[in-house]
Every structure is written in structure tokens, then in C-alpha cells.
Regions:
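Vicinal oxygen chelate
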Residues: 2-9, 23, 32-37, 57, ...
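Acidic/histidine-enriched, glycine/proline-rich intrinsically disordered or flexible terminal extensions
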Residues: 2-8, 171-233, 371-410
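Short beta-strand/turn micro-motifs at beta-sheet edges
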Residues: 14-17, 96-102, 229-232, 294-300
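Short, flexible turn/loop "capping" segments at secondary-structure junctions
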Residues: 18-22, 103-107, 233-237, 301-305
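Core segments of cupin and vicinal oxygen chelate
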Residues: 20, 30-86, 90, 234, ...
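Generic structural signal for well-ordered beta-strand positions
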Residues: 51, 160-161, 266, 360-361
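Intrinsic, low-complexity N-terminal interaction/targeting segments
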Residues: 85-89, 96, 124, 286-290, ...
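A broadly used, surface-exposed interaction patch
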Residues: 88-90, 97, 105-111
Length: 410
């Protein structure tokens, strides 16, 4: 890790304030009490595909430790080719196995995971965090998923993961066979490592059947014409994020995400006397939003979670309108108590609740920040009328801009 000048790090030939650069939100997860309903909600209603599961119960010291606590499996889910972009674990089992989880039951988010640009960046981050006294939960390589990573805590004990190189699920829909989990690492790896391609080549030489991994079968028939493709629901998730958090101290949380993880402040809002902060990792208006805990009750949201909302971007405005009807028809609870002032950079959005009461923010458009680093002036933003959903919209200058979805929708 070479440095040049005052506290600058050479990241691929560019001098940065951190020895890594976050490119995007890679995945995110909840700890749920209502596991059966949660799996159905996220897979059948929202369209996440289960790419793998693992048995959390294997960590128990005795069968009695987790007896009667429900589904032992953790579910790894995807909307595209990344092995997982969303993860569900059983909250009661995690608390039974982990004293820290028992001590902080309001931390129902199990991970906030950010993609960096290379394995070297992960390795340099691990070293730098250690030098700065940033508490590291663990480092290594996960299986399932194959992502090289390190986990650190923010000022509210949310677990943030930095990773590189997550497994890709290809055209046949099969995840990596479990026999290939021998490349799991439980500590920071020595660099360089062999490539993913060479791992597959070795598996073929060893006679591994590459199609023996998990393959998801959708529980609903593909009856909706979604812009020319038949899908089981009338919309398609094409991106995850932003992550919106309730925090004890907005200033302290902002300092961690800015100074330690390298996020950039895009905008701040004062709402009913409370400061709210919107930060970005790339060109999107915000990939992270920070709100004071005092707003939970004012917004009618769960008082026992630090998750304000988890964002899901749909492919277009028409699909967002279709999603509102589809989810309402299938019994999803919707709230209109989250005012537009608290999600600048997004125009039309709907907020729905999962079976545990976590708020999900569905939207289709995210304002993009250009070369000068300035967001769109407030007076030039679209101003939706509450409760009105026009049949069609005039475009903004950055409509359909930002991170694209790669590959087929289904």
C-alpha cells in the first residue's frame, strides 16, 4: 500500500483519502422473526431468487440452544447475477447464538455491504482499519458467495462489509456447488490469490459437477407481460439501495461514513428541527441516508429497529405503478407517512412493510450527480402531488441514468 503526499493512498494509480474506493451497495440483509412469511414476501412478491441457504444451527453448542426458534436456515437471495444482493437470517437464532445480538436487539440489519474495486483494496482496507483502531469483526472469504471481505462497525454498531469478487450466477441459474467451498478463508488472505476462473478449472479437473449447486424455481407462474418479457410479477428490481438508517448521533455517523469509508455528502435536510444527511458512494444522489432516532415515532415506523428504509429501484415508472397495485392486492401494508422531503433525489416512491415491519422504499428514478459534485437545485426537481400517479411523466435530464441492470430480467 503505497502512499504519496499527506495522508493519500495510491488506489490503482489515483491518490485517494482511503486505500480503497466504494463503488456501489453490493448486498444488504435483515434478521427476521417471521421467517416463513419473510421468505415468501421477498421471493414470491418482490422477486428475489434464492441462490443458496446455510444451516445456522450448526453453530449451536447443543440442540437445546436453538430448540423451538424456527427455521435454522439463512437465505441468500439475488435479483440479478450477483450470488446475493439480499440476505435473511433468523433473528431469534442469531440472538441465541450471539451475545452481542442479544444485547442490541434493535440492530435488525445483519449487514450493509459495499463493493470496492479489487482484492488489493480489501487487503489494504484491513491493514488501514487496524492502524486506525477501527474495530474489525472478521475478514476472509465467505462461502456461499465467494466474496473476499472485511467487516467493520459504524458508530451505532451497524456491520459494514467491504468486499470484492462476488460469485456470479449464470444463464443456467446454478450457484457454485458446496464442494467448492474449500476456498473459504477465515482470516485475511495472502495476496495474490488465484482467479475465480482457475478455481473453476481446478474443480473440473477434480470431477466436480458444476450444475450440482442450488437452482431457484419461482413459486408463481410467469403471466405478466413486463415490457415484452413474461414474468411472475409486473415489475423487476434492477438495483438495491439506498440504505436509510436511524442513528443516535447523526454527526458521529456522518463522520464515520465520510472519514472511514469515504462517502461524500450530497445534501442535508432539516425536517421538524432534525438534521438528516444524504451521502453517496458514486454518482447516485445518495446511497446512504442518516436520520436521528427521534424520527422513528414521528414517521410511524418500527420503534425497535434502526432501519428507516431499504431502497429497491424498479426498471421504470410504469413498473412502479404496477408494483403498488400488485403488492396491495397481495396484502402488503403500505404507508404514506414518509414525506418526500425525507428522500431528496427520488421523485415517485412507495413505502411498504415486510412481514416483520421493516420499511422498503420502492422507486424508479434516482437523481445523478455530475462532474462538479453538485446535486440538482431543489427548485428544479419534480414535485409529485401526494396520492397522484400520472399515466406518464415528462423526462428529467437524468432519467434512466446511473448504474444499469446487466443481463435478462428473467
Amino acid at each position: 500500500m503505497e502512499t504519496s503526499g499527506q495522508m493519500k493512498f495510491n488506489v490503482g494509480g489515483v491518490l485517494l483519502d482511503q486505500p480503497f474506493k466504494i463503488r456501489r451497495l453490493g448486498h444488504f440483509g435483515f434478521n427476521l422473526v417471521n421467517m416463513e412469511e419473510g421468505v415468501r414476501f421477498y421471493s414470491e412478491l418482490l422477486g428475489f431468487k434464492v441462490s443458496d441457504n446455510n444451516d445456522m444451527g450448526r453453530r449451536a453448542t447443543s440442540p437445546e440452544q436453538i430448540a423451538g426458534l424456527g427455521d435454522r436456515k439463512g437465505y441468500f437471495m439475488r435479483y440479478g447475477t450477483d450470488h446475493h444482493s439480499f440476505v435473511i437470517f433468523n433473528k431469534r437464532i442469531r440472538e441465541a447464538l450471539n451475545p452481542e445480538a442479544r444485547a442490541r436487539p434493535e440492530l435488525t440489519i445483519n449487514q450493509i455491504t459495499w463493493q470496492v474495486g479489487s482484492l488489493r483494496e480489501v487487503g489494504n482496507a484491513i491493514k488501514w482499519f487496524g492502524e486506525r483502531g477501527v474495530k474489525i469483526q472478521r475478514s476472509g472469504r465467505d462461502m456461499p458467495g465467494s466474496n473476499w471481505h472485511t467487516y467493520v462497525y459504524d458508530s451505532d454498531r451497524h456491520i459494514n462489509e467491504l468486499y470484492y469478487g462476488i460469485e456470479q450466477v449464470g444463464w443456467n441459474g446454478h450457484s457454485k456447488p458446496k464442494v467448492m467451498y474449500n476456498r473459504r478463508f477465515d482470516e485475511a488472505p495472502e495476496l495474490p490469490q488465484i482467479s475465480e476462473f482457475d478455481e473453476v478449472q481446478q474443480a473440473l479437473k477434480d470431477g466436480v459437477e458444476l450444475t450440482s449447486g442450488h437452482r431457484h424455481i419461482d413459486g408463481l407462474p410467469a403471466t405478466y407481460d413486463v415490457d415484452g418479457i413474461l414474468l411472475p410479477r409486473p415489475f423487476k428490481i434492477v438495483r438495491i439501495g439506498p440504505v436509510s438508517l436511524f442513528v443516535k448521533d447523526v454527526d458521529a455517523a456522518e463522520a464515520f461514513y465520510r472519514d472511514t469509508l469515504g462517502f461524500i455528502l450530497t445534501e442535508e435536510v432539516s425536517w421538524q428541527g432534525h438534521r438528516c444527511v444524504f451521502m453517496r458512494a458514486n454518482t447516485e444522489h445518495h446511497s446512504l441516508a442518516l436520520y436521528p432516532l427521534a424520527l422513528r415515532e414521528k414517521l410511524g415506523l418500527r420503534l425497535d429497529t434502526t432501519c428507516m428504509a431499504f431502497g429497491l429501484q424498479l426498471a421504470n415508472y410504469q413498473q412502479l405503478r404496477n408494483a403498488v397495485r400488485f403488492l396491495s392486492d397481495h396484502g402488503a401494508r403500505v404507508t404514506d407517512r414518509v414525506p418526500a422531503e425525507l428522500y431528496p433525489g427520488i421523485d415517485y416512491a412507495v413505502h411498504v412493510f415486510d412481514p416483520d415491519g421493516h420499511c422498503l422504499q420502492l422507486y424508479y428514478y434516482m437523481e445523478q450527480v455530475g462532474w462538479d459534485g453538485k446535486p440538482r437545485p431543489k427548485e428544479l426537481r419534480r414535485k409529485p402531488v401526494h396520492g397522484e400517479w400520472p399515466a406518464a411523466l415528462e423526462p428529467m435530464s437524468d432519467t434512466y441514468h446511473g448504474e444499469p441492470f446487466l443481463g435478462p430480467w428473467g
